[in-house]
């Protein structure tokens, strides 16, 4: 699979089914090698820049540990750590970093920014999250589902419940279409994905033997699901009126025990990209409770802590799948 060498990883839509399967298989191989102590560093003497406009726990740790395991050196540039967007354009930053580093990870706001970095840096660029997409997350989600369910990807009934327009929902729909999955997106009509993205994903799903269903009918949408997935309903910094409207729309779509039972599948698993507002024990969770009287948002605490929940295995797999992306695009095989 040498054709992934020097490729950027900006969106799953840039990759074929065979290429995504290769990345997932490589993730399994690298994970196994790490566990049994036979991992071989394939990124020796590589220098990697982590460019973060948004803070993160999982994405930063996954990239740093993966790079260290593989022998690479990392420079972390946080939200105040570079001049990009303030005194320097993304195009100029790309050319500066591209002259010093062998690869660049970007986590921030605009998909256009990560595309600009890839266009002008001359080195592989990896999308750690934008407002529109989150491709590295989906690799971890799919790997976890396969590990736990013991099913091939095309045999998994994958259901996302919640805000159908957000970056994780977008990325999951893309990935499911590419892998030929049966994918359900259960959300209020007001929060459906864009027609443009939906039409493109439906075409890809048809080509790969998959299926996509968009519905606001919870009973219909979750029936026979193997995976129930959700994400946060709102983002920090959005105005109060947006919060109120979003909470009103999404409250019926909370992932709780009753919703899991509607799947009719006693072995259904629960996934979440994290962090999650499943209780009021965080600063923001407490603020939400005080302002809106809600102690559990997108998922209830009992589901989050249940045997169905695989969120921490999923979080670990961020590291293994991100390692696979870096090795495949930058490594010396």
Swiss-Prot record:
It is an enzyme of class 2 (transferase). GO terms for molecular function: amino acid binding; ornithine carbamoyltransferase activity. Carbamoyl phosphate binds at residues 56-59, 83, 107, 134-137, 273-274, 318. Pathway: Amino-acid biosynthesis; L-arginine biosynthesis; L-arginine from L-ornithine and carbamoyl phosphate: step 1/3. One of its GO terms (biological process) is L-arginine biosynthetic process. Its main location: cytoplasm. Has vitronectin and fibronectin-binding activity. Reversibly catalyzes the transfer of the carbamoyl group from carbamoyl phosphate (CP) to the N(epsilon) atom of ornithine (ORN) to produce L-citrulline. Belongs to the aspartate/ornithine carbamoyltransferase superfamily. OTCase family. PANTHER family: ORNITHINE CARBAMOYLTRANSFERASE, ORNITHINE CARBAMOYLTRANSFERASE, MITOCHONDRIAL. This is Ornithine carbamoyltransferase. It comes from Staphylococcus epidermidis (strain ATCC 12228 / FDA PCI 1200). The lineage of its organism: Bacteria, Bacillati, Bacillota, Bacilli, Bacillales.
